Amino acid sequence: MNDREFRVVGLRRTGNHAIINWILQQVDGTVVFVNDIFINENPFRTVVEVFESQDPDFYWRANRIKSNPLYAGEDYLDNLRKEANRDFIPKDLLIFSLEDYRLKLMDVKRYQKRHLLYFGNSKEKTDILILRDPYNLLASRLKNERIGLKTRSYLKPFADV
């Protein structure tokens, strides 16, 4: 069982990682950060599959979790497999981020049930919602993607702004 769990929710380019990194610097003990999870997939199983397949499109993303001491060293894959198979390693703090999800998708019973299967239980749970000024968010996304306004589906809601 985890002592604490932070679920961080925000749109891409809202400063999620800056805030999460700030939190990580404030906490001692066993801390695990799972970045940009998919709501309907076991994030640990996904990471294990990526490492085993060495898919270059996703390897860089999964490789970040190896920076955590819990998954470092030669047995990192064994520890990740334990987590994927619901043999959870106790953590002082578990942080996971969700990016570009509608909030109402996270309150349904199906999500809550899967959450327990994927992460186990935590004594204390905290939701963190990160907001950013919509004009700055749009400008950041456009600059980061170097794309036209109508080419990405997540930018279309801003087209009328």
Q: Each PLM stretch: what is its role?
A:
Residues 87-161:
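PAPS-dependent sulfotransferase catalytic domain
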